[in-house]
Swiss-Prot record:
Organism of provenance: Citrifermentans bemidjiense (strain ATCC BAA-1014 / DSM 16622 / JCM 12645 / Bem)
NCBIfam families xrefs: argS
SUPFAM superfamilies found in the cross-reference section: Anticodon-binding domain of a subclass of class I aminoacyl-tRNA synthetases, Arginyl-tRNA synthetase (ArgRS), N-terminal 'additional' domain, Nucleotidylyl transferase
Protein's UniProt name: Arginine--tRNA ligase
Reactions this protein catalyses: tRNA(Arg) + L-arginine + ATP = L-arginyl-tRNA(Arg) + AMP + diphosphate
Pfam families the record matches: Arg_tRNA_synt_N, DALR_1, tRNA-synt_1d
Length: 554
């Protein structure tokens, strides 16, 4: 509706230019917003105020000229009024609102989608947890966020690839290998003083048991270096397979898994450093190599290669992001834990050093999750240092509830996740409240058929939808494409969970006040069934884009 109104306003301005009532000139960006109070109309624009200086007229005078041109010029507009210093308020015809229902029915599963992305290639890299232990609930929030952002961008017409970056090159892999080897020796009877720096979780014992089952005592007879290398590879592979399975159980499948080690094996770290040196962006000081991140606004330059010749994580990130853009992505999006916020300026510096615009890299920061049970905080880790895993949470509350709860707040704000609330089958549970709205609509259709009323939508009399409840529900449906687009370009899937709760609320309010199946009024019955058909489409589409099911029975 906003886009239609913008087009109408633009046509009106151009008409004023053509007839001389306004002096021809540049048309500003036309802002159309929903007023805070319903009495001020359905929409408002400040375009007259924006044009006043150019036109050398008072804003209200410009508004009066535009209102005269727009009045009666569109089948959208019921009436217009000028408010305050020059705002133009629009009251939309009920018939225009009702036409949204025809659009929804025609679009079906595509309702809400757009082509604003124009096929632009986008990569969303998320989760990317070290293959040194199972995913915890913090990873779960990042997983839900990254997957939902990728789906939103796809729905907005972008060509999206999901990628997992495997951090398999670094000291953590040696630590994993040593942890596995020591647990293996312990299982075979050696007395081991297990270091605190090693991975403490019971999953390391599982890896060791697996090795004993398959290989017996073979690795008691090899050098420590070879034993560490073996358990680093075996442990990493097993853990990564477990991570992949947990993510699949959570409804997430990656298009590509990218190994950090491959950057070294294929010489990409070396060539990236050489490219930056050739550009004068990497210099040597005190035996180390430094990137001139201060050239791009960072607070200090950053080490790429230490004086002992060992590369930093930053070196890998330079090579990795260089590789991403070399693969043809126009827009690269990284989903990180909020504790990495200090890393943002240096990576933006890299992107600019590669000759790209800083905006070609989008970074989503995901804050911590606090677990609750009936409002009481739950211990997030055991004495051995094991965090509550994503698998444990999904097994307890289910995939749908977990995904919805992870997406209920802005990703950069802390999230309270109440396990008992997530399982509750009541209106207090937001995911139940939303899914029940969809199931309830399907139940209404079943009831209609049981009463001999077969829904037929070929010639629905939409003008019969006249009550405030009817029209309020229609208006809420009409904003879904705008919500979807805003969620995509701003990386904010919580906009969809908010919208779903509002739409479910509008539906439940409508149903409590309105009779849907009225045998003595068959045309009104068909109109209201058509309205609910459109609500069901919108609920399902919005849930689907978040990776959540829309059950027909509950």
């Amino acid at each position: 509706m906003k886009e239609q109104l913008r087009a109408c306003i633009l046509k009106g301005i151009e008409g004023c230019f053509a007839d001389g009532t306004l002096t021809s000139g540049e048309v500003p960006a036309i802002n159309v917003e929903k007023p805070a109070h319903a009495e001020h109309g359905d929409f408002a624009t400040n375009v007259a105020m924006q044009m006043a200086k150019q036109q050398r007229k008072a804003p209200r005078a410009v508004a009066e000229i535009l209102v005269a041109k727009l009045a009666g010029a569109s089948d959208l507009i019921e009436s217009l009024e000028i408010a305050g210093p020059g705002f133009i308020n629009f009251f939309i015809k009920d018939s225009a609102w009702r036409r949204t229902l025809t659009e929804i029915d025609r679009a079906g599963d595509a309702w809400g989608k757009s082509g604003i992305g124009r096929g632009k290639k986008v990569q969303v890299e998320f989760v990317s947890a070290n293959p040194t232990g199972p995913l915890h609930i913090g990873h779960g929030r990042g997983a839900a966020t990254g997957d939902a952002v990728a789906s939103l961008l796809s729905a907005a017409g972008f060509d999206v690839q999901r990628e997992y970056y495997i951090n398999d090159a670094g000291n953590q892999m040696n630590t994993l290998g040593l942890s596995g080897l020591l647990r293996y020796k312990e299982l075979l009877g050696e007395k081991i003083d297990f270091p605190e720096t090693c991975y403490q979780g019971d999953y390391m014992k599982d890896i060791a048991r697996d090795a004993v089952t398959k290989y017996g005592d073979r690795f008691l007879k090899v050098s420590q270096e070879d034993g560490v290398a073996f358990f680093s590879k075996m442990g990493g592979d097993l853990i990564l397979a477990g991570i992949d399975q947990d993510l699949q159980d959570f409804g997430i499948r990656f298009d590509h898994w990218f190994s950090e080690q491959s950057l070294f094996d294929e010489g990409k770290v070396k060539s990236a450093i050489e490219e930056m040196q050739a550009k004068g962006l990497i210099y040597e000081q005190e035996g180390a190599l430094w990137f001139r991140t201060t050239d791009y606004g960072d607070d200090k330059d950053r080490v790429v290669v230490r004086s002992n010749g060992v590369t930093t994580y930053f070196a890998s990130d330079i090579a990795y992001h260089r590789d991403k853009f070399a693969r043809g992505f126009d827009w690269v999006i990284d989903v990180w834990g909020a504790d990495h916020h200090g890393y943002v300026p240096r990576l933006k510096s890299v992107v600019q050093g590669l000759g790209r615009d800083a905006s070609d890299l989008g970074i989503i920061l995901v804050q911590l999750v606090s677990l609750l049970r009936d409002g009481v905080p739950v211990a997030m880790s055991t004495r051995s240092g094991e965090f509550v895993t994503l698998k444990e949470v999904v097994d307890e509350v289910g995939r749908d509830a977990a995904r919805f709860f992870f997406l209920m707040r802005r990703s950069d704000s802390q999230l309270d996740f109440d396990l008992e609330l997530a399982k509750r089958q009541s209106n207090d549970n937001p995911v139940y409240y939303v899914q029940y709205a969809h199931a309830r609509i399907k139940s209404i259709f079943d009831t209609a058929r049981e009463r001999g009323v077969e829904p037929r939508f070929d010639s629905v009399k939409l003008e019969l939808l006249q009550t405030p409840e009817d029209l309020s529900l229609v208006k809420k449906l009409s904003v879904y494409p705008e919500i979807l687009e805003g969620g995509a370009v701003n990386f904010e899937p919580h906009r969809i969970t908010y919208y779903l709760q509002e739409l479910a609320g509008e539906f439940h309010s409508f149903y409590n006040k309105s009779r849907v199946i009225t045998p003595e009024e068959p045309e009104l019955t068909q109109a209201r069934l058509f309205l609910l058909h459109c609500v069901a489409i919108t609920l399902k589409n919005a849930l689907t884009v978040l990776g959540i099911s829309a059950p027909e029975r509950m």
